Amino acid sequence: MKLEDIRREYLQNALSEDNLLDDPFKQFETWLEHAVASNLPDPTAMVVATVDDTGQPSQRIVLLKHLDNDGFVFFTNTGSRKAQELKGNNKISLHFPWHPMERQVIVYGEAKPLPTSAVAKYFLSRPKESQLAAWASAQSRPVSSRKVLMETFANMKNKFAKGEIPLPDFWGGYCVVPQKIEFWQGGAHRLHDRFMYQRQADNSWQITRLNP
């Protein structure tokens, strides 16, 4: 297989500063709405990049669960690798790869832990099976087999058979407060359109076109 021959031209759209909204959150919402309306699979899926204390980065796909003018919100097991890395270094990057639309968005910022009340509100909105899975999984830690995992899930199902499933004390959430947000639109001949929003001291945003 010749990987160097695998390519395609990006011809769907062009992006100019005249097309951009002044507010990057509103611009993101507009693009996300387009992704949802276009029936893209998992339009809220984002690659979350963190770094450990040796400088080794790691990535994983997580779902965006809320967006407002404070930032981008996701939830996770606080014993997970990403949560442990964020304890030591809360710098974070998010990547939304909307390939069918020839678009991507990259967010650079800091992850701020959410208050327990916000975490509990979201946790209780999840399907019961997802709540049980949160209790059953010691995320990122070794497990001897899937059978063991499913047995733990069954035990949790029995344990919480009646009443409301409580919020695990090892489950939390983060708001990613962005300092920079890049919007990328594929262009013909690899002459892509890239615009970077950078937060200013007064919380306004400066927009700069970048070379592809």
From Swiss-Prot:
Transmembrane segments: none
UniProt catalytic activity: pyridoxamine 5'-phosphate + O2 + H2O = pyridoxal 5'-phosphate + H2O2 + NH4(+); pyridoxine 5'-phosphate + O2 = pyridoxal 5'-phosphate + H2O2
CC cofactor: FMN
SUPFAM superfamilies attached to this UniProt entry: FMN-binding split barrel
Binding site for FMN: 60-65, 75-76, 81-82, 104, 139-140, 184, 194
NCBIfam families: pdxH, PRK05679.1
Domain of life: Bacteria
Residues that hold substrate according to the record: 7-10, 65, 122, 126, 130, 190-192
EC number: 1.4.3.5
The protein's role, per its UniProt record: Catalyzes the oxidation of either pyridoxine 5'-phosphate (PNP) or pyridoxamine 5'-phosphate (PMP) into pyridoxal 5'-phosphate (PLP).
Keywords from the UniProt entry: Flavoprotein, FMN, Oxidoreductase, Pyridoxine biosynthesis
Species annotation: Pseudoalteromonas translucida (strain TAC 125)
UniProt KW RNA-binding keyword: no
UniProt protein name: Pyridoxine/pyridoxamine 5'-phosphate oxidase
Pathway the protein takes part in: Cofactor metabolism; pyridoxal 5'-phosphate salvage; pyridoxal 5'-phosphate from pyridoxamine 5'-phosphate: step 1/1; Cofactor metabolism; pyridoxal 5'-phosphate salvage; pyridoxal 5'-phosphate from pyridoxine 5'-phosphate: step 1/1
Textual note on the cofactor: Binds 1 FMN per subunit.
Molecular function GO terms recorded: FMN binding; pyridoxamine phosphate oxidase activity
Pfam families: PNP_phzG_C, PNPOx_N
Entries under PANTHER family matching the protein: PYRIDOXINE-5'-PHOSPHATE OXIDASE (PTHR10851:SF0), PYRIDOXINE-5-PHOSPHATE OXIDASE (PTHR10851)
Family: Belongs to the pyridoxamine 5'-phosphate oxidase family.
Gene3D superfamilies, per the entry: Electron Transport, Fmn-binding Protein, Chain A
Quaternary organization: Homodimer.
GO biological process, one term: pyridoxine biosynthetic process
InterPro entries recorded: Pyridox_Oxase, Pyridox_Oxase_CS, Pyridox_Oxase_N, Pyridoxamine_oxidase_dimer_C, Split_barrel_FMN-bd
